[in-house]
């Protein structure tokens, strides 16, 4: 009787697990984040003074053969400070991505309702996509840009500025006006 019960239990386990083994084999590790962070909060300082703060509701890190990257699918917020630790710049986007290539190159991309504010100059810039060249300390886009300031309104295609949005230049302006 014990032998029949044991044989039945073994047969049941082998039969019930048989169809599920293929599911584990089909999992592609490149499509699954290796790290997930909820309510991410980063502060960058130099000599004890805050330079930058970044926040995101969710960060997902992925690893590939040629690069690793972090995705921020639920929004990304960056705050830049002056040397006197006064809040100067805000960058807000629906989504962002930070690419790190194995050869050492890096690229930050913000996309979807990107808003860049320089609070000191009272300038607001809106675009769909923004890139940050961290090595050269520049932000830029090739997309349509609107910029509001106390001096007027500008719009055009393509923009470049230092990373604090202090010196924004719109490359192909049109229908702009000054006050």
Task: Locate the predicted segments by residue.
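Mature-chain termini and adjacent capping regions
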Residues: 1-179
